[in-house]
Amino acid sequence: SLKIEYSLCKHQSTKLWNLLNSEPYINTLGSLSGNHAVQHAKAGLKAIYLSGWQVAADANSAGEMYPDQSLYPYDSAPKLVESMNNALIRADQIQHMEIIDGDMKKENKVDYMLPIIADGEAGFGGPLNVFELAKKFIKAGAAGVHFEDQLASEKKCGHMGGKVLVPTGTMIKNLKAARLAADIANVPLIILARTDANAAKLITNDHDDNDKPFLTGERSPEGFYYVKAGIDQAISRGLAYAPYSDLIWCETATPNLEEAKKFADAIHKKFPGKLLAYNCSPSFNWKKHLSDDEIASF
């Protein structure tokens, strides 16, 4: 059969991986459009983040303003990745011609081809849905995609109450599905595993051995099981996801360096050098929890 090459995804994924392994950290900002992405490149950023809440609010194919609950059509984010990459490629082409024509000095060249890390939400379903979504991100030229361990049909913003976890094993199946899509496409797509277990108090069922230590024995009116939220539950899941992801992200309710360090230390004790991600969210009340100096150095 015909072998299709996904050269943009392959190039950008490799570029992101090299950046992650050569820089102390990579700071990104959420980009809402192709023009926005171009401005981020001009500002000197080395990567671009595509946020699901931004897609929900103002960049989805339904043309609606949604809350951050995965209500938008599932192909919205891949389409935005494609739009951003098209804008970045065009900016790079224009710059190339300006250098050739002598209108711009080569030493002033901007790196427009920034790798895009996209929000895959909770996958919009099960492993098959995750597989298809990952394929669309690959076709669009994404460098990385993150998936979270919430129940897709009950998905909430990471800083809202009422989050429902899927069993640890179910999340691992989703991560495997994303990796399978990348392997079939022959691309080194960067896969990030996000856990919402630090704040989530509900889980769909009680069958997974990794989740049993955190069960309270109580049930919700919807039939979900209550679990003990907290950093220990998040660590348990981070350790379980580590073999199946390139980076691990622990979603926190506040900008908390102590929690971040505890999570990082626990992961690195078993998986030395494992790459981690942190959400410096605009939803945080930074002033309430940190001083100006702490915010500046966060």
Predicted regions and their residues:
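Alpha/beta enzyme core
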Residues: S1-F298
